[in-house]
Design a protein with these regions (language model features):
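Active-site-lining helix/loop region of Rossmann-like oxidoreductase modules
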Residues: 1-82
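C-terminal active-site/capping subdomain that shapes the small-molecule cofactor and substrate pocket
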Residues: 46-159
Length: 159
């Protein structure tokens, strides 16, 4: 997890639920970075969000299990259509045929891939989804550019 830590576990055939060092709140530095960056991107310092980061043995591509709660209920098909219509995102969602995003097949691509879209059985107005994206190809620079393009197109930002 970190060169400064005394224990080092094998990564092959293993998952390590720690990236970086633990903080006083028992989250790791990487988890707090995800939380704080998401709040910053969303311009909402009060956004309720949590994260668990796990070191996994993949060549590349970050993967996230995301849980989103909305103020009002949505139909699953409308949620899927909204995701699919967004530039830079591709739905890859046919679980009955074992089609869903995986790092092995989404690495070295510029888009992010979404699958396993479903209602959260534990909370109304809430959906779960699985997102995979190549952090090298779809990093901060490309993502920022694409967000700015959408903002300009929608009149949310002037040229």
């Amino acid at each position: 997890p970190s060169a400064s830590l005394p224990k080092h576990y094998p990564i092959a055939f293993n998952l390590i639920p720690q990236i970086d060092v633990f903080l006083d709140n028992l989250y790791t530095k990487e988890e707090m970075k995800m939380i704080n960056e998401t709040r910053k991107i969303m311009h909402d310092d009060e956004m309720r969000i949590t994260a668990t980061t796990v070191r996994v043995p993949v060549y590349r591509s970050h993967s996230e299990s995301v849980n989103i709660e909305f103020e009002h209920d949505l139909e699953l098909k409308d949620m899927a259509a909204a995701i699919n219509a967004f530039p830079g995102i591709q739905m890859m969602d046919d679980p009955s045929n074992q089609i869903y995003p995986m790092p092995l097949y989404t690495s070295e691509k510029y888009d992010c891939f979404v699958g396993r879209l479903r209602r959260d059985e534990s909370n109304p107005n809430t959906f779960n989804l699985w997102v995979v994206g190549d952090q090298i190809r779809k990093g901060a620079a490309l993502n920022t550019l694409q967000i700015a393009e959408v903002m300009i197109k929608n009149g949310w930002l002037e040229k």
